[in-house]
């Protein structure tokens, strides 16, 4: 690690509002479709944002996918209710909009396409013909906004129950329980809900049998221990062979994006911890960075290193649970108990620094909650001396076991093409040989100042390769923590900026104006300038991102959370068809997901 850490204030701020007209893809689009074919929106997302006509969508998408350095991954797709948005200067008229976020690995660049829709014509052609992973994203957008995707293979609810009325992310849909009538579960309603959960194969394009045999349909979950949460997979079986399967999600849906519209920018931080409840501060990182882009805040170097340190501690904590439970899914119990001993040491350190364990809610807009306590370095030193030997013992005792290898090598295998088509990120993508880790490819919070490697597989992502990459990632996180320990900068733990929240208490004592300013910022929350911002991070399970829209208020107009687990579960049928039920159990253990991350 560089001892004289980079002065980030001397660099071009990441929060500048830009239209990205200098991005090569804008020129390529204009050359193909004409200079007046679309509207370019200036934002603080860090990517070109281009409004196109609905009729151009598939043609533009196909063009981007076939460029010499193509946009090969549909990273995200969702909608927005634009009807109450007041700051829309220069944008096409729209009651609703749909956005498509595409990534080019070769260019290491993104582009966001937007389509404007009128309330009386909420139709847009399905994107599944170009990107198969658009399936779930379009279902969710229809479920929560009521936007119809013409030609979609099975446009039905995915987050809400099939019997639900209305579309919750619309602005005219209530955001608080007190706005609803008291909930009553009558016998008739209970029977209706149970009937709605009955799986009908024909609705999913499945056959109940052939001339010579009948298929068996088996519910795995939503209460099966190997489902790793409230998650159901309906299996179509020929003997023990999986002919097809349908993942059924939404049981853990809490309306996290809707909550973002009624919490202040500051008070939403605790909710971010619970999106992926094992990641802790890792989940706070993309949110606070996106808010800081809106606010125009550049944090001190000490804040960057503290944030990296906490993120890597939680990465190790999550990986330890993942590795040990994977081994347990295959059939060995002992490593789980050893791993919880190691995780307790991390929790002791996290608790000493933040005051909390799993959900610290410790990052702040402009910094962290408080400075590092005395003795933090001793606790970290003890952990760094302890963990490498333990990791070696796991690898020797369990991960090199011939039975475990036989159960996991070659199981649920896919290549780079399939990974990109399904929006796979994290170890699942890197196992295919694609070297893409956001900490290296698009450094944030000072990761460019750290010396560490990105483990990459040999071309095929199977269960065993994914697990072994996580083991090596754990070692690299230990390297990063060592550098944090040896090179922690001096300086403040918060930025000196008017929108840093909470503001310094001592400024309230100057005169009545500063007291009122402090009172409003703490009670109502800071007012963020009207704009859009975006931040992705390499989270514990893949790429996690927040796409925030501010309308110049104390609360977010739209909070879009893209989680890696959502994309990874959608890929299950494509990766497991033709395998056995026992292989599915191993595959689920190798994905590394929690349902709170999927359902939000």
Curated annotation (Swiss-Prot):
Pfam families registered for this protein in UniProt: Complex1_30kDa, Complex1_49kDa
Enzyme Commission no: 7.1.1.-
Protein name: NADH-quinone oxidoreductase subunit C/D
UniProt KW NAD keyword: yes
Organism lineage: Bacteria, Pseudomonadati, Pseudomonadota, Gammaproteobacteria, Enterobacterales
Membrane topology note: Peripheral membrane protein
Region NADH dehydrogenase I subunit D, annotated ranges: 214-600
Organism for this UniProt entry: Escherichia coli O1:K1 / APEC
Family assignment from sequence similarity: In the N-terminal section; belongs to the complex I 30 kDa subunit family.
EC class: translocase
Record-linked HAMAP family: NDH1_NuoC, NDH1_NuoCD_1, NDH1_NuoD
Locations listed in the record: Cell inner membrane
Region of interest (NADH dehydrogenase I subunit C), residue spans: 1-190
An annotated GO cellular component: plasma membrane
InterPro entries hit by this protein: NADH_DH_suC (IPR010218), NADH_DH_suCD (IPR023062), NADH_Q_OxRdtase_suD (IPR001135), NADH_quin_OxRdtase_su_C/D-like (IPR037232), NADH_UbQ_OxRdtase_30kDa_su (IPR001268), NADH_UbQ_OxRdtase_49kDa_CS (IPR014029), NADH_UbQ_OxRdtase_CS (IPR020396), NDH1_su_D/H (IPR022885)
Domain of life: Bacteria
Subunit-level organization: NDH-1 is composed of 13 different subunits. Subunits NuoB, CD, E, F, and G constitute the peripheral sector of the complex.
Protein role: NDH-1 shuttles electrons from NADH, via FMN and iron-sulfur (Fe-S) centers, to quinones in the respiratory chain. The immediate electron acceptor for the enzyme in this species is believed to be ubiquinone. Couples the redox reaction to proton translocation (for every two electrons transferred, four hydrogen ions are translocated across the cytoplasmic membrane), and thus conserves the redox energy in a proton gradient.
Catalysed reactions, as listed in the record: a quinone + NADH + 5 H(+)(in) = a quinol + NAD(+) + 4 H(+)(out)
GO terms assigned for molecular function: NAD binding; NADH dehydrogenase (ubiquinone) activity; NADH:ubiquinone reductase (non-electrogenic) activity; quinone binding
UniProt keyword annotations, A-Z: Cell inner membrane, Cell membrane, Membrane, Multifunctional enzyme, NAD, Quinone, Translocase, Transport, Ubiquinone
Coiled coil: none
